[in-house]
Amino acid sequence: MADADASDRVRTLLLRGDNLLKHGRSQDKAREAFEEARNVAQEAELDEPVRQLIERRLEQLA
């Protein structure tokens, strides 16, 4: 996956997770979106600040 594609995918997954939480939907589904974003970011070796943002989202659900 190209960096631009990976960045777009991570952005989409973060928005999905945030929207699920914002609208009181399943925390499990939000966690799944954030975990998938983490995997995409790691595989594409995206910048550390992006990965830290994802980790913060996951920590908020712990």
For the regions a protein language model found, what residue spans apply to each?
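Conserved structured catalytic cores and adjacent interaction surfaces
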Residues: 37
